[in-house]
């Protein structure tokens, strides 16, 4: 049984409230869970201490027993100092696309041609 530490949505329409729960990965998002581990209220201010509440002791216990947190929960755990979130590394994303590289090469070529023409005119 693969266990996930994830968010289960509660609250009413347009007023979300989430429970941080331990659940089987195959169970529905708001369905059966094994243990309630905390809560997240995105409607509160970001600096409010009640915005994210976690039971760090139980979360550590379940992480040691193989439970996998979802990305959003891992962000909360990283902020609380319970778990370490590795920085994502995508070096390809930093490179411009093919057409942008072509445009940059054309622009550089035009600048070089203009500089050469200016040098010829100065002589």
Swiss-Prot record:
Keywords, sorted A to Z: Ribonucleoprotein, Ribosomal protein
An annotated Gene Ontology molecular function: structural constituent of ribosome
A Gene Ontology biological process term: translation
Comp. bias intervals (Basic and acidic residues): 99-110
Biased composition (Low complexity): 111-123
Gene3D superfamilies: 3.30.1320.10
InterPro entries from the UniProt entry: Ribosomal_bS16 (IPR000307), Ribosomal_bS16_dom_sf (IPR023803)
One GO CC annotation: cytoplasm
Signal peptide start and end residues: none
Disordered: annotated span: 87-123
One Pfam family recorded for the sequence: Ribosomal_S16
Annotated family: Belongs to the bacterial ribosomal protein bS16 family.
HAMAP family linked to this entry: Ribosomal_bS16
Record protein name field: Small ribosomal subunit protein bS16
Originating gene: rpsP
């Amino acid at each position: 049984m693969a266990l996930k530490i994830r968010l289960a949505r509660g609250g009413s329409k347009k007023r979300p409230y989430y429970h941080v729960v331990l659940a089987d990965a195959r169970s529905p998002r708001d369905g059966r869970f094994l243990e309630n581990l905390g809560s997240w209220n995105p409607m509160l201010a970001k600096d409010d201490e009640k915005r994210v509440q976690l039971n760090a002791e139980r979360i550590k216990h379940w992480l040691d027993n193989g439970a996998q947190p979802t990305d959003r929960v891992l962000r909360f755990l990283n902020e609380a100092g319970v778990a370490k979130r590795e920085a994502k590394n995508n070096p390809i994303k930093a490179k411009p696309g093919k057409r942008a590289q072509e445009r940059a090469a054309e622009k550089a070529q035009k600048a070089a041609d203009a500089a050469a023409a200016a040098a010829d005119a100065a002589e």
